Amino acid sequence: MVYNTSCLILPLALIILDFTLISSLAHPIPSTLNVLSYGAKPDGSKDSTKAFLAAWDVACASANPTTIIVPKGRFLVGNLVFHGNECKQAPISIRIAGSIVAPEDFRIIASSKHWIWFEDVTDVSIYGGILDAQGTSLWKCKNNGGHNCPTGAKSLVFSGSNNIKISGLTSINSQKFHIVIDNSNNVNIDGVKVSADENSPNTDGIHVESSHSVHITNSRIGTGDDCISIGPGSTNVFIQTIRCGPGHGISIGSLGRAEEEQGVDNVTVSNVDFMGTNNGVRIKTWGKDSNSFARNIVFQHINMKMVKNPIIIDQHYCLHKPCPKQESGVKVSNVRYEDIHGTSNTEVAVLLDCSKEKPCTGIVMDDVNLVSVHRPAQASCDNANGSANDVVPFTPCLKREIIIT
């Protein structure tokens, strides 16, 4: 007897397909993923790195929005890298009720440039929680002149990412920068707290580089370096309602370290309180040839309290001697200072040290009143051009506007 095998194959294939569909429906990816379910321990001593990565892999594979829960407790993790290039691009929220802590031995995470790194992700949000990088021992190593100290790891990094939200997060004791936004678009950072010792080296609070449409709001930052720094290639950055101190202020730069370098365009810094910082609002560029630029910058509605350099443009920036002897090639233009008041901890409250090669142009000051706590405040300026209205101290390089009413 001859059987028609084709008649058997088709029903069998349909049965297998039906079974696969039923299995997938019976075990859908849940919308909420608790890291405890993947082996994480909230005791601060067991390594939970693999558990966090496992939870991410499941969320990444979901075609629907998912939330990763980090409950109360202390979760010890090493270097975490969350890749997004193979995700289905559904929104992922990470809600942290407890603390994520790094190992006490700083060398464990310092072997990498990043402690917690999100790479090529889209629609990722982080809410609440504490990141404790336990960087104090590395700071001591560096401050004591140790030659074998590693550079250190940045605590939280987003690179090549889009539509990112960080809300209510606290970052403490970072080895290096606390929060880094690199080569990313549409980023909102709100209500974060950053804390590190004022002598902690290179611990910028929030650093933005090569990124576009970044909003930083309602945050308190006290650290050993810039509270917020805006690096090359950044555009459309909005900073509002910030308390900065201790720290080195809010900086555009440093720029011009490389000869071929993107510039910074369209930055607004508004409603900021500087408390005992080394600088207030600063633009810093290296004294060397470069095609970089800083333009269309607004600093407004700012209070200074015992700030060493409330307003400063430093186009001869240099960290370590010997310093370059060239003039800076970075072009600084269209910078507006408006409604800035308070006290300077030094005699020179306004320092505009611009490049001879490319003088600053379009510098506008309006309603600026800075007084020195020791003696009458002064302004020092070189190679700066622009206008001033109602400015104390008198800034001779800026023409006084005549207001006709």
Curated annotation (Swiss-Prot):
UniProtKB keywords: Cell wall, Cell wall biogenesis/degradation, Glycosidase, Hydrolase, Repeat, Secreted, Signal
Gene3D superfamilies for the chain: Single-stranded right-handed beta-helix, Pectin lyase-like
PbH1 repeat ranges per the UniProt record: 184-210, 211-232, 264-285
Primary location class: secreted
Transmembrane residue ranges: none
Position of the signal peptide: 1-26
Catalysis: reaction(s): (1,4-alpha-D-galacturonosyl)n+m + H2O = (1,4-alpha-D-galacturonosyl)n + (1,4-alpha-D-galacturonosyl)m
Catalytic site positions: D225 (proton donor), H248
Pfam families in the record: Glyco_hydro_28 (PF00295)
Annotated EC: 3.2.1.15
Tissue: Expressed in developing and germinated seeds in the chalazal region immediately adjacent to the site of penetration of the radicle through the testa.
One Gene Ontology term, aspect cellular component: extracellular region
Alphabetical GO biological process terms: carbohydrate metabolic process; cell wall organization
Coiled-coil ranges per UniProt: none
Stored PANTHER family: PTHR31375
Name used for this protein in its record: Probable polygalacturonase At2g43860
Species for this entry: Arabidopsis thaliana (Mouse-ear cress)
